[in-house]
UniProtKB/Swiss-Prot annotation:
Outcome after substituting residue 151 to A: Loss of DNA glycosylase activity
Organism field: Mus musculus (Mouse)
EC number, as in UniProt: 3.2.2.29
Consequence of gene disruption: Embryonic lethality between 10.5 and 12.5 dpc. Embryos display specific patterning defects of the developing heart; vasculogenesis defects of dorsal aortae, carotid arteries and branchial arteries. Global defects of angiogenesis are also observed. Defects are due to epigenetic aberrations affecting the expression of developmental genes, coincident with imbalanced histone modification and CpG methylation at promoters of affected genes.
GO terms classed as biological process: base-excision repair; base-excision repair, AP site formation; epigenetic regulation of gene expression; negative regulation of transcription by RNA polymerase II; regulation of embryonic development
Name of the protein this chain belongs to: G/T mismatch-specific thymine DNA glycosylase
Length: 421
């Protein structure tokens, strides 16, 4: 009886503390009594104290039971930040892919540039080697004209001749003005002193890709050396091929900074000589003020007249330039429409390589301009030649030839009537 009283007393306390699970515990009590029937009397006297001590210890054990699922939920939360970490790796790989693509693009670009650089203008000769070369002067005594350039370019140093560029207008203007009887090219530069009294020199001897690579010190020294050359050979006319050259020369030699420089004869002479100074437009095709060769011929014609005047040669009244007008806008439009390709490339420069230009363009028939300087119109009357009839596709078109008078000592009656009109 005492054991039963103690068991009921302990159950009442447990029921007071745990009201909700009381029914479940009551269902398990008979089984506990059966299994522990022999041990209960020994533990019964201290049962009250044991239950009193165990109840508060068991209470906190059941309290975190609802928190256990929270911990389980936290585990996936803790794992959630790891999930985006895995896609970050392919993100970095994407960046690397972009970088590889950009590298591929850069490689393609560099390959394209390498292809352009492989264009061999000088047949294997490096630019550094050309910079060490110089262009020899073509000077002698009793010259009528000395053409003065700034300094040799790469092509001139490579060819070893003056004004070798196909786009340069010098040789065309020389022929169109009548200073030479036939069309010449850079390979004929050494023959000009004996045939036409024309020589060549430069203000600075050093070869550069452009005149901008020269220093002011080189211009000063070059100006002094040029004066010494002109004082030695004393030509009749010193022709400066471009305004820029004469402006530098005038400042260094005469001490005069020219303002509003005009082409043609200048007021100053070379010191201690009777050599006149004459300024022409640059024969380079890059001259924006005169984009075509025919725009520069006027100043070559005036140079020829000045030379004849100094030599005492009477001018032909039938063949002379009465009036000259120039419209830059019309010239630029005309150059774009008609003469752009012709100005950039001249078949005449193939003569050095045994090209078609070296052959006789007339083929035994009368030409537009004969070798003796007389026009074909003075020999036999012919119809106007179409531009396609120009031999070997030369640069001079029939439309422009009509604008330039023939430079000969005798003219036809038709030319006389036109000149008087």
């Amino acid at each position: 009886m005492d054991a039963e009283a103690a068991r009921s007393y302990s159950l009442e306390q447990v029921q007071a503390l745990y009201s909700f699970p009381f029914q479940q515990m009551m269902a398990e009590v008979p089984n506990m009594a059966v299994t522990t029937g022999q041990q209960v009397p020994a533990v019964a006297p201290n049962m009250a104290t044991v239950t009193e001590q165990q109840v508060p210890e068991d209470a906190p054990v059941q309290e975190p039971a609802p928190e256990a699922p929270k911990r389980r939920k936290r585990k996936p939360r803790a794992a959630e930040p790891q999930e985006p970490v895995e896609p970050k790796k392919p993100a970095t790989s994407k960046k690397s892919g972009k970088s590889t693509k950009s590298k591929e693009k850069q490689e393609k670009i560099t390959d394209a540039f390498k292809v352009k650089r492989k264009v061999d203008r000088f047949n294997g000769v490096s630019e550094a080697e050309l910079l060490t070369k110089t262009l020899p002067d073509i000077l002698t005594f009793n010259l009528d004209i000395v053409i003065i350039g700034i300094n040799p370019g790469l092509m001139a140093a490579y060819k070893g001749h003056h004004y070798p560029g196909p786009g340069n207008h010098f040789w065309k203007c020389l022929f169109m003005s009548g200073l030479s009887e036939v069309q010449l090219n850079h390979m004929d530069d050494h023959t000009l002193p004996g045939k036409y009294g024309i020589g060549f020199t430069n203000m600075v001897e050093r070869t550069t890709p452009g005149s901008k690579d020269l220093s002011s010190k080189e211009f000063r020294e070059g100006g002094r050396i040029l004066v010494q050359k002109l004082q030695k050979y004393q030509p009749r006319i010193a022709v400066f091929n471009g305004k820029c050259i004469y402006e530098i020369f005038s400042k260094e030699v005469f001490g005069v900074k020219v303002k509003n420089l005009e082409f043609g004869l200048q007021p100053h002479k070379i010191p201690d000589t009777e050599t006149l100074c004459y300024v022409m437009p640059s024969s380079s095709a890059r001259c924006a003020q005169f984009p075509r060769a025919q725009d520069k011929v006027h100043y070559y014609i005036k140079l020829k007249d000045l030379r004849d005047q100094l030599k005492g040669i009477e001018r032909n009244a039938d063949v002379q330039e009465v009036q000259y007008t120039f419209d830059l806008q019309l010239a630029q439009e005309d150059a774009k429409k008609m003469a752009v390709k012709e100005e950039k490339y001249d078949p005449g420069y193939e003569a050095a390589y045994g090209g078609a230009y070296g052959e006789n363009p007339c083929n035994g028939e009368p030409c537009g301009i004969a070798s003796n300087g007389l026009t074909a119109h003075s020999a036999e009357p012919r119809g106007e030649a179409a531009p396609s009839d120009v031999p070997n596709g030369q640069w001079m078109a029939q439309s422009f030839a009509e604008q330039i008078p023939s430079f000969n000592n005798c003219g036809t009656r038709e030319q006389e009537e036109e000149s008087h009109a």
